[in-house]
């Protein structure tokens, strides 16, 4: 029996892949008894050959049931997504960098990692400037940009203190001088441009 517009396409298409022994209709191994922690590697993997050989027993069942791929998506929705693991090379670089830091730099690094601008405050400031509601993602991004900006100003001020031979509790004049030095580098937008026309 042929269905669809293509010839040679049988009604027995698009269902459960062949070769999934020991799995229930959702593709979950029966030996796990509902525990999805440790799936068997070989038995329940969906391979590209299996996707091409999908079969179904009857037309009514295929029309009412969602495809196998869609069932898999809904099954994994409730599970925690695993975070991608960090490369060993990246971890090695980070440990090398941290071991090369002095005590002062390490304490500053830890404080910098822990600090963050409050998202609600950033969103309210952005709303007062734009006059529109601000999406949460935009407030988070702006808070991150502000943190980087403050870090650059502080680093410039610390470099100036080191150049002048001063000790690090930064004074307001050091921060003002750092801002003045960063303006020509293009870090600050110039608000005082004259409009020619």
Swiss-Prot record:
Residues 72-88 have a biased composition (Basic and acidic residues). It comes from the Eukaryota. Residues 59-88 are annotated as: Disordered. InterPro entries: Histone-fold (IPR009072), TAF11-like (IPR045127), TAFII28_dom (IPR006809). Transmembrane segments: none annotated. GO terms for cellular component: transcription factor TFIID complex. SUPFAM superfamilies: Histone-fold. GO terms for biological process: RNA polymerase II preinitiation complex assembly. Expressed in fetal brain and testis. This is TATA-box-binding protein-associated factor 11-like protein 14. The lineage of its organism: Eukaryota, Metazoa, Chordata, Craniata, Vertebrata. The gene is TAF11L14.
């Amino acid at each position: 029996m042929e269905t669809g517009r293509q010839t040679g396409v049988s009604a027995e298409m698009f269902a459960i892949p062949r070769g999934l022994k020991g799995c229930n209709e959702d593709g979950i191994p029966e030996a796990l008894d509902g525990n999805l922690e440790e799936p068997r590697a070989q038995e329940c993997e969906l391979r590209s050959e299996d996707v091409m050989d999908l079969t179904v027993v009857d037309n009514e069942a295929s029309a009412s049931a969602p495809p196998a791929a869609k069932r898999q998506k809904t099954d994994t929705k409730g599970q925690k997504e695993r975070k991608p693991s960090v490369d060993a090379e990246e971890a090695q670089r980070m440990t090398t960098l941290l071991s090369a830091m002095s005590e002062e730099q390490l304490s500053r690094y830890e404080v910098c990692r822990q600090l963050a601008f409050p998202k609600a405050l950033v969103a309210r400031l952005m709303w007062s400037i734009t006059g529109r509601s601000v999406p949460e993602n935009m407030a988070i991004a702006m808070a991150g940009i502000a943190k980087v900006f403050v870090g650059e100003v502080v680093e410039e001020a610390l470099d100036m203190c080191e150049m002048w031979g001063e000790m690090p509790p930064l004074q307001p004049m050091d921060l003002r001088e750092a801002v003045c030095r960063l303006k020509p580098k293009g870090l600050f937008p110039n608000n005082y441009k004259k409009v020619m026309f």
